[in-house]
UniProtKB/Swiss-Prot annotation:
Keyword Cytoplasm among record annotations: yes
Biological process terms in GO annotation: ribosome disassembly
Residues involved in GTP binding: 17-24, 81-85, 135-138
Residue intervals of the tr-type G domain: 8-282
Record family assignment: Belongs to the TRAFAC class translation factor GTPase superfamily. Classic translation factor GTPase family. EF-G/EF-2 subfamily.
SMART domains, per the entry: EFG_C (SM00838), EFG_IV (SM00889)
Record-given protein name: Elongation factor G
Chief site of localization: cytoplasm
Single GO cellular component term: cytoplasm
HAMAP family linked to this entry: EF_G_EF_2_B (MF_00054_B)
Native source organism of the sequence: Pelotomaculum thermopropionicum (strain DSM 13744 / JCM 10971 / SI)
Function: Catalyzes the GTP-dependent ribosomal translocation step during translation elongation. During this step, the ribosome changes from the pre-translocational (PRE) to the post-translocational (POST) state as the newly formed A-site-bound peptidyl-tRNA and P-site-bound deacylated tRNA move to the P and E sites, respectively. Catalyzes the coordinated movement of the two tRNA molecules, the mRNA and conformational changes in the ribosome.
Subcellular localization(s) per the UniProt record: Cytoplasm
Keyword ATP-binding applies: no
Length: 692
């Protein structure tokens, strides 16, 4: 099948922002103006195309990343609308990994909010070029210039206005296009008709000053343009566009636009900017990976004639077609019905059907090419972060890292009939979401589910009921504590059994040591001279990993440790993988007990917005919750307190804050890091856990 759009006419973009900045509303308008939908859906009415889950329509928030495609000015734009709520950060992380560019939406009143910072840092991590869109210019308190200042100060970016608003709040009626030096005035409510005029006289001075800044910013990153500018004092429209595109692709500049998506103003110029300034798959560096056989580095150019390579970035269960695997094609082609090699798991799989998604509607396609973002049916073992490639030319692309869950609840089925269904439902939901974990409490045998926050787990339980018809009782939220060690220690692990016939023999000497926070688990073998045959070494690793699931202090999972296998011995007849696995587990537990084990708890980054008169009371309360105040700032006549507070102290905080501030305070929090629990508190937690 011939390619419908040349690769340079393709844009893979994400729309990202803080909750309620207007991402989904902006996407709805994009779909309307590109002719993808013929009636505008509204988030507050529960009819938004991209928010297709029942929970999204009820709550007016985006939970999953919905994918869709549309066309504008001969370009195919693949859009992923991502959630803004902090509990669903994983959705943003995996979307940014496979996108080429992004539109960051900001609220003109709130400016840069906490989750805006989080998604911006995630985009920085993957080097994603982006443009900023300051939305809600029609709201009371809208301030375009403060928005730009906050992008500069709080995100450390280099924002450059390429538009100015005409009017503000109720009077917002259009934008000044600084590149073309013209004004665009919207003349109807739907925003489909607009007229282009001279810049209004009252804005002429400001527009000239901002246009000069724009030209200087563009010329700064391009010597030939700088020379031309110094000679003529001016650049043509085409030169400004080319310079802006180059600087945006190099992540040196963030072009800033404005509008009001809800009032249908400013969306078509945003579409133009997506086409003009965001990258095509051919503009980004070739993807790098590793050959799983030789370990050598591999490069895949974004071309159809290269060997096939793709990254699976999301799994979804569809009630009609079963398991859907979303993937981004980096190079080559793949036909529907053909076989593909999962190099991460060393498995060959058959692609039953390939679908192009429009939110939750699907369109079958016969073949995908480089640069496409599509979903496949029929991949049974593939999970998030796996590489799919050509079996003759294998490659493993860099995967994604996901944060550890911070909160857990016990869950039990209401009836015997729900028991079996619950296991299947939880397994499917865990496949879809890498930050959602299912485990069993070793003491009580209860099923525990862990996630990124109360809303995250609430949605999971809700989905179990709606999609899998499982009724469950849910316990009170608990903190997902972890354990780690503070010093090096070594120990022996011996497992010897002599019962008539063949016995069991495994003997290892292990050293356990602390690693940097967030660096995870690392196993190293220093066995030389075959004192332990190499086929038994992975079993020692597996035994240590298994022992880490229940730590030595209070049975919490152990994180950030290194295990080194130093020595051991084996028996010609009696040794087996099982014996070495058990020996590894015994050795790890013994070494961990000697390595000064400590309890860790999740610490949240909290931002509280209150009136000045309540400041003292709120700060005193945060201190009593073991909080550490970082800084305070004034914003829009309110006081903003930034603090780090342990999650254990934040349950019920919303109600508490409301009563302290007479309902006028609000807060946001997101996971920051794990930190050691103070000894006096750790003793109580361990006693409750062990003594029940």
């Amino acid at each position: 099948m011939a390619r419908q759009f040349p690769l340079e006419k393709t844009r893979n973009i994400g729309i990202m922002a803080h909750i309620d900045a207007g991402k989904t509303t902006t996407t709805e308008r994009i779909l309307f103006y590109t002719g993808r939908v013929h009636k505008i859906g509204e988030v507050h009415e529960g009819t938004a195309t991209m928010d297709w889950m029942a929970q999204e329509q009820e709550r007016g928030i985006t939970i999953t990343s919905a994918a869709t495609s549309c066309r504008w000015r001969d370009c195919q734009i693949n859009i992923i609308d991502t959630p803004g709520h902090v509990d669903f950060t994983v959705e943003v992380e995996r979307s940014l990994r496979v996108l080429d560019g992004a539109v960051a939406v900001f609220c003109s009143v709130g400016g840069v909010e906490p989750q805006s910072e989080t998604v911006w840092r995630q985009a920085d991590k993957y080097g994603v070029p982006r443009i900023a869109y300051i939305n809600k210019m029609d709201r009371v308190g809208a301030d375009f210039h403060r928005g730009i200042q906050m992008i500069r100060e709080r995100l450390g970016a280099n924002p450059v206005a390429i538009q100015l608003p005409i009017g503000v709040e109720d009077g917002f009626c259009g934008v000044v296009d600084l590149v073309r030096n013209r004004a665009i005035i919207y003349t109807d409510d739907l925003g489909t008709t607009s007229e282009e005029t001279e810049i209004p006289p009252e804005l002429a001075g400001e527009a000239a000053a901002f246009r000069e800044r724009l030209i200087e910013a563009v010329a700064e990153f391009d010597e030939s343009l700088m020379e031309k500018y110094l000679e003529n004092g001016e650049l043509t429209e085409e030169e400004i566009k080319e310079g802006l595109r180059r600087a945006t692709l190099a992540v040196k500049i963030v072009p800033v636009l404005c509008g009001s998506s809800f009032k249908n103003k400013g969306v078509q110029p945003l579409l133009d900017a997506i086409v003009d300034y965001l990258p095509a798959p051919t503009d980004i560096p070739a993807i790098r990976g590793v050959n799983p056989v030789s370990g050598a580095g591999e490069v895949r150019e974004a071309r159809d004639d290269e060997p096939f390579s793709a990254l699976a970035f999301k799994i979804m269960t569809d009630p009609y077609v079963g398991k859907l695997t979303f993937f981004r094609v980096y190079s080559g082609r793949l036909k529907s019905g053909s076989y593909v090699y999962n190099s991460t798991r060393n498995r060959r799989e058959r692609v039953g059907r390939i679908l192009r998604m429009h939110a939750n509607h699907r369109e079958d396609i016969e073949e995908v090419c480089a640069g496409d973002i599509v979903a496949a049916v029929g991949l049974k073992t593939t999970t998030t972060g796996d590489t799919l490639c050509d079996e003759k030319e294998p490659v493993i692309l860099e995967s994604m890292e996901f944060p550890e869950p911070v909160i857990q609840v016990a869950i039990e089925p209401k009836t015997k009939a729900d028991q079996e269904k619950m296991g299947v439902a939880l397994q499917k939901l865990a496949e879809e979401d890498p930050t959602f974990r299912v485990s069993t409490d070793p003491e009580t045998g209860q099923t525990l589910i862990s996630g990124m926050g109360e809303l995250h787990l609430e949605i999971i339980v809700d989905r179990m009921m709606r999609e899998f018809k499982v009724e469950a009782n849910v316990g009170r939220p608990q903190v997902a504590y972890k354990e780690t060690v503070r010093k090096k220690a070594r120990a022996e692990g011996k497992f010897i059994r002599q019962t008539g016939g063949r016995g069991q023999y495994g003997h290892v000497v292990l050293e356990v040591e602390p690693r940097e926070p967030g660096s995870g688990y690392l196993f190293t073998s220093k066995i030389i001279g075959g004192v332990i045959p190499k086929e038994y070494i992975p079993a020692v690793d597996a035994g240590a990993k298994e022992a880490m699931e229940n730590g030595v202090l209070a049975g919490f999972p152990v994180i950030d440790v290194g295990v080194t296998l130093l020595d051991g011995s084996y028996h010609e007849v009696d040794s087996s993988e099982m014996a070495f696995k058990i020996a590894g587990s015994i050795g790890f537990k013994d070494a961990a007990r000697r390595a000064d084990p400590v309890l860790l708890e999740p610490v949240m980054k909290v931002e509280v917005v209150v009136n000045e008169e309540y400041m003292g009371d709120v700060i005193g309360d945060l201190n009593s919750r073991r909080g550490r105040i970082e800084e305070m700032e004034a914003r829009n006549g309110m006081q903003v307190i930034h603090a780090y507070v342990p999650l254990a102290e934040m349950f019920g905080y919303a109600t508490d804050l409301r009563s302290r501030t007479q309902g006028r305070g609000n807060y946001t929090m997101q996971f920051s890091h794990y930190a050691q629990v103070p000894d006096n508190i750790a003793e109580g937690i361990i006693a409750r856990r062990v003594g029940r």
